[in-house]
Amino acid sequence: MNDSSTSNRKALFEEDKDLKVNKRADALLERKQQEAEFELEKLQAEERGEDFDRKRAWDWTVKETEEWKEKKERKRERESQSGVHDMSSTAQRAYEKDLASFKPDLETYEKEKETGLHHTPSFNHKPTPEALDRLVNGLTKGDKQRMKRRKQAGADDQHATYISDKNKQFNEKLNRQYDKYTKEIRDNFERGTAL
């Protein structure tokens, strides 16, 4: 029994030491170190009179280089299409996408224009069955897309700690705020060393 308590205590101290280490700061430090090494190699190659980019390209095959260029091009296209991510630009893109898929019935419009029904205010307009079908199909398509996204977003949950979507959002917000404080308690509870 004494061995188990000492091993638990050692594990507790190791975990506490790991918690004190800031993983984000370590990653930042490592990235800066890699950038510094890269710059050092570049300067050394320039001092020797070598073409640094050409020397680096020796490590890659032609296929890898082409795939990398294609990947960069796709990323550049995505970034240029997406632009700034705010609600008004997102709504504008959705509107333009819907407008591009919208096919107006010009024949019916011309007939209404000739008869004068288009310009007189009246409440006796009845849409055609085709127009109603298009409306219903558009609405069901949007609903299916929203449900698909909702299912994909919830697929990664191991166990449900919520009763509705709003409650799930609230719980996620709490987790972001308090996980750093409650992680140790949860780990102790799972390990069986809770006080």
From Swiss-Prot:
One of its GO terms (biological process) is RNA splicing. It is found in: Nucleus. Involved in pre-mRNA splicing. Residues 22-50 form a coiled coil. GO terms for cellular component: catalytic step 2 spliceosome; post-mRNA release spliceosomal complex; Prp19 complex. The lineage of its organism: Eukaryota, Fungi, Dikarya, Ascomycota, Saccharomycotina. This is Pre-mRNA-splicing factor SYF2. Pfam families: SYF2 (PF08231). Associated with the spliceosome. Residues 66-80, 94-117, 153-164 have a biased composition (Basic and acidic residues). Keywords: Coiled coil, mRNA processing, mRNA splicing, Nucleus, Spliceosome. It comes from the Eukaryota. The gene is SYF2. Residues 81-92 have a biased composition (Polar residues). Belongs to the SYF2 family. Residues 66-164 are annotated as: Disordered.
